[in-house]
UniProtKB/Swiss-Prot annotation:
Stretches assigned to coiled coil: none
Family: Belongs to the BABAM1 family.
Gene3D superfamilies (UniProt xref): von Willebrand factor, type A domain
Name of the encoding gene: babam1
Name under which the protein is recorded: BRISC and BRCA1-A complex member 1
Provenance organism: Xenopus tropicalis (Western clawed frog)
Keyword Magnesium attached: no
Region (VWFA-like): 86-287
Keywords of the record: Cell cycle, Cell division, Chromatin regulator, Cytoplasm, DNA damage, DNA repair, Mitosis, Nucleus, Ubl conjugation pathway
Length: 318
């Protein structure tokens, strides 16, 4: 005869409730679970990482969506909405003036005009989210040139945005861009990366359109230090010609940019210049998220429902 006593209510196996509107992300189920340390993230949402010399001079990661890095350990930063210093770098190569993008009304548009419009919408929307955000505008021909200094007034940035012309460019000096930013920008430092929020973060958004030219870059120690900084992010929107003949070439260039992200915290997008302009705008809209609060790019989902398949026509643009 079984004389064992029935289990008390507290001894029963913890049975989690489904994620519902009244129970977001299983909030009530976390009461009995061990809490994470201050400033830590859930698994898969870590921020900066440190490894011994993770950035060789030549880097390549052959993937369109870089997976989270497999590193020995990751530095986790507080998920705070601190001010951003956003440096928007716009490529002015002749490819940007090609009339191949499909605009919203069915006519053809060039990448420069579409980029100018989406940059203005991005700056104005970020300003509405947090008026402490600051923006700077850099244009790139053969060399990078600082066009507008840091300002929290969107009108100052937009006033410099539209009087631009494309040029025939031989190469893109990415090293010169990094040096220019290091000269003009002070990177924040905190006593404890995991628990103390930074006063601000620095982010570059590079809009690049040179299918046959890989940027010239010789990584110096200062550049490696900048790329490994937990408060620095290097987002890229790469506009390529989309031709099958040059597919391997533009994929190599995209892999080059992916390989610069040793922390796995930056976002990289590739867009065909023969596709819809909506796709280009959607990429910029996805960059509205604060870099300290967004997940790894491979973990990001933009559908309202998990089973809903993502389609360009159904996405929301700013």
């Amino acid at each position: 005869m079984d004389t064992s006593e029935p289990l008390e209510e507290g001894d029963r196996t913890h049975e989690q409730r489904p994620h519902t509107r009244s129970n977001p992300e299983g909030a009530e189920d976390r009461e009995g679970l061990p809490q994470a340390g201050v400033g830590s993230r859930s698994e898969g949402e870590g921020e900066a990482a440190q490894v011994d010399d993770p950035l060789p001079t030549t880097t390549a990661v052959p993937t369109n969506c870089t997976p989270p890095p497999t590193l020995e350990f990751q530095l986790k930063t507080p998920r705070v909405n601190c001010p951003e210093k956003v440096i928007i770098c716009l490529d002015l190569s002749e490819e940007m003036s090609t009339q191949k993008l499909e605009s919203f009304n069915g006519s053809k548009a060039n990448a420069l005009n579409s980029s100018q419009k989406m940059i203005e919408m991005f700056v104005r929307t970020k300003h509405k989210i947090d008026k402490r955000h600051e923006f700077a505008l850099v244009v790139a021909n053969n060399e990078a040139m600082w066009l507008s200094g840091f300002t929290s007034d969107p009108r100052e940035v937009c006033s410099c945005l539209y009087d631009l012309e494309t040029n025939v460019c031989e190469s893109f000096n990415l090293e010169g861009l990094f040096n220019l930013i290091q000269q003009r920008t002070e990177f924040p430092v905190t006593d404890n990366v995991q628990t103390i929020p930074p006063p601000y973060v620095v982010r570059i958004i590079l809009i690049y359109s040179r299918p046959a030219s890989q940027p010239a870059l010789n990584l110096t120690d200062n550049m490696k230090k900048m790329l490994q900084c937990p408060y620095f992010f290097f987002d890229v929107i790469y506009i390529h010609n989309g031709s099958e003949e040059e597919e391997l070439r533009w994929k190599d260039i995209f892999s080059f940019f992916s390989g610069l992200d040793s922390k796995g915290t930056s976002y990289k997008y590739e867009v065909s210049i023969t596709g819809p302009a909506l796709e280009l705008h959607n990429c910029m809209a996805r960059l509205l998220a604060h870099p300290l609060q967004r997940p790894f790019q491979s973990h990001a989902a933009y559908s309202l429902l998990e089973e809903e398949e993502e389609s360009p026509e159904s996405e929301v643009t700013v």
